Amino acid sequence: MTAPILAAAVFCITVSVVQLTSVAIAVGRFRRSGPSGPPSKLPSAVGHFPSVSIVRPLCGIDNYAEETLSSTFDLDYPHYEILFCVASAKDPVVPFVKTLMADYASRSARLLIGDDRVSPNPKLNNVVKGWRAAHHDWIVIADSNVLMPPDYIERLFASWRDDTGLVASPPVGCRPDGVWAEVECAFLNTYQARWQYIVDTFGFGFAQGKTMLWRRGDLDAAGGIEALGKEIAEDAAATKVVRGAGLKVRLVNRPLAQPLGRRSAAEVWNRQLRWARLRRASFLLY
């Protein structure tokens, strides 16, 4: 066997072993997650069902917006408030949210409008007012296109430990409409999610901006919500803030759904390209 053939064989075997091992670890994580549904108690590091503030930054109306946003009101958790954040009063999502709030009038929900320029990141600028207005010490920042299951908050708390500074969840793409949405599902649900769970299993978890559970004091000790403006992406800054405090980012064992709907080739390509550039800018080795 010539040297090039031997090298190619070793490379193929190594890659196959790495791939199969990564799949086995990811599958093992999901199987350990247990049955769905609200637990009878939360980890000791959390306490007995503490009150939670959910901050949802909005911009425009996403695919499946009625379902994803209304899911915020249907959580099976005893004490939580909802803060919808919009940068402009002219955003078409404003009347949409007002209608939802009227339909769920028994829930504690507020719509906050305004643009606080604390960073070059428009999402973070939108979130700031929600963070400042939150009544509770446990705060979830969740993108508008996350579909929240009834046990959403319990699912986040279940991963919190004494050494945790943040719990996040990678998105699981679902309900694709068309070939390019299928491509994005394939990326989200295989390569991206799998490798995030690999590094998390070994204690090197990365924040994912789709959903982030914070304890207010941890972020305030690092300079407050404005500290997330130190990087181009708020989740990259979150990872560095948590690690800088000697704490860990952890992922939920059962990731959260993101309904995709229709996608064009350009949308998928541009999104993946933007994420790749953000990763390279914030974490050069990754």
Question: What are the residue ranges of the model-derived segments?
Answer:
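Short aromatic/hydrophobic "clamp" motif used to bind/position activated sugar donors
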Residues: V127, I139
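N-terminal membrane-anchoring/stem segments of glycan-assembly enzymes
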Residues: M1-A45, E182-A186, R194-I198
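Acidic donor-binding segment of Leloir-type glycosyltransferases
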Residues: L69-V118
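Catalytic donor/gating beta->alpha subdomain of glycosyltransferases that bind UDP-sugars
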Residues: W160, L166-Q192, G217-D220, I225-Y286
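The conserved acidic donor/metal-binding loop of glycosyltransferases
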Residues: D143-L147, I225
